[in-house]
Structure formats: structure tokens, C-alpha cells
Amino acid sequence: MSTHDRSLYLKYAEALSHPGDFSSNATSFFAQDADINVVHPFNQLTGADAYLNEFLLPLQHSFKGLYRRDDIFMAGEFEGQNWISSTGYYVGQFVRDWIGLKATKTLSYIRYGEFHRIEKGQAVESYIYLDIPELMIACN
């Protein structure tokens, strides 16, 4: 695992750690044809545009002041492939309904875990897990 691959992810993570426009960093982090697998109801997305338009921007629209807090970060090689992984929470005030869940108008935390395979300085294969059931419980 090169330090370039690590710094690439850390730049992406840093951009998500503050409320604002995440678009430019997402488009530079993911390869144009990246295979991005997000939990249901998002499922398989192809490329940064789909990731932004179908997952990240709607999430940001529903959670005012959304930012992401990374708690654990790991990077290394497995079977000749470079992988980066992190876990933590998306945090924001749940102000608009999202994926069928009614907005609570309260500060909400969504636990996440991500795994990204890196090639040529971009994520080409990703698995993104969100603890939506925990959010459902918080919403009643």
C-alpha cells in the first residue's frame, strides 16, 4: 500500500468531515466506472456520479449540517490488492424524510463501514455499509 493511496483516502475523508459540498472529492476519489456497492435500498452503483446522485447528495439533503466522523482507519494489501477501510458515523440533523423514514428533526448518527479497493490512485471497487436498522429504531 503506497502512502499516495492512503493520502488519497484521507483527503476524501477530510472533505466529508465538514458540512459542505462533497462532490468534487467524491468524483476524484472514485474511478469513473467504479463498482460501488451500498446497502439496500441503494445496492450496486456504477461510478462517482451514481454514488453522488443516488446516495450521498440525497443523504446530505435530508440531514442538515451532515458530516462524517471517521473513528477507525486501516489500509493494507490483501492477496495482491490494495484496500482501505474505515468506520465511524455520519452525523446531522434529520430534517427531511429519507428512504421512507420520517424526519425526526433531531441530531442523528448513522454508523457506517467502508471498504475500498484502490488501483491507479482511485477506488475501483467499494462496499459501503450503513446501519439503517439502528436509524429506524431511533425514528420509532
Language-model segments: which ranges?
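C-terminal and inter-domain tail/linker signature
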Residues: 1-140
